[in-house]
From Swiss-Prot:
UniProt protein name: Uncharacterized protein R740
Lineage, top ranks: Viruses, Varidnaviria, Bamfordvirae, Nucleocytoviricota, Megaviricetes
Domain of life: Viruses
A UniProt-annotated Pfam family: MTP18
GO BP terms, alphabetized: mitochondrial fission
Length: 187
């Protein structure tokens, strides 16, 4: 009988889970609603434990990094194109645009807006003596959570306008699409 040496695995152990994790990360990057997890965290700040608030920010930041990674990976072909006598390549402009846009639309503006709503609601309910203390405690949370869907489009539009009048003018970059609620990776 012919004895063959045992065949070794073609895939190294360190890369065994890379494929499924990559598919999971790509699916996560297409889930735009994950970028609003920090809004939920901000709305519940002071009412829920800080670990919950911090974990919601971690979800948002993770989404942003995963989305930017796949934008980077899917658009490397732009790195050789230079336009508008700029020192930046089209790829650098593209990545800069999306990084700054996410910083505004997913973190900065929602945090300020939700924090203002929570503070204003707390201040308003503090002066109403006949309200149940539990209502006073949870009214800011409920109102903030209820307003999150109403804030998405105006905040995205504000970030678009700011980018149009600052970054796009400065770098001569024109984004191809502004459908931020759809995944950039589905095309």
């Amino acid at each position: 009988m012919d004895k063959r040496p045992e065949e070794t695995s073609v895939i190294p152990e360190s890369l065994k889970y890379a494929g499924p994790m990559s598919r999971l990360a790509r699916a996560f990057s297409g889930f735009r609603m994950a970028s609003y997890a920090s809004d939920v965290g901000e709305a519940t700040r002071g009412t829920f434990p800080n670990q919950f608030v911090h974990s919601m920010y971690a979800v948002t930041i993770s989404y942003i990094f995963v989305d930017l990674y796949f934008r980077y990976k899917d658009n490397k072909h732009l790195s050789n194109n230079k336009q508008c006598d700029s020192k930046m390549t089209e790829f650098q402009k593209y990545m800069g645009y999306h990084t700054l846009w996410h910083a505004q639309a997913s973190l900065f503006f929602p945090t300020i807006t939700i924090h203002s709503i929570v503070s204003s609601t707390k201040e308003f309910t503090a002066n109403i003596n006949w309200l149940n203390p539990k209502v006073k405690k949870f009214a800011p949370v409920c109102l903030s959570l209820a307003l999150i869907p109403c804030l998405i489009k105006p905040i995205d539009d504000l970030a678009d306008k700011i980018m149009d009048y600052s970054y796009c003018k400065l770098t001569c970059y024109q984004p191809h699409d502004k459908h931020h609620t759809e995944s950039a990776h589905e095309n």
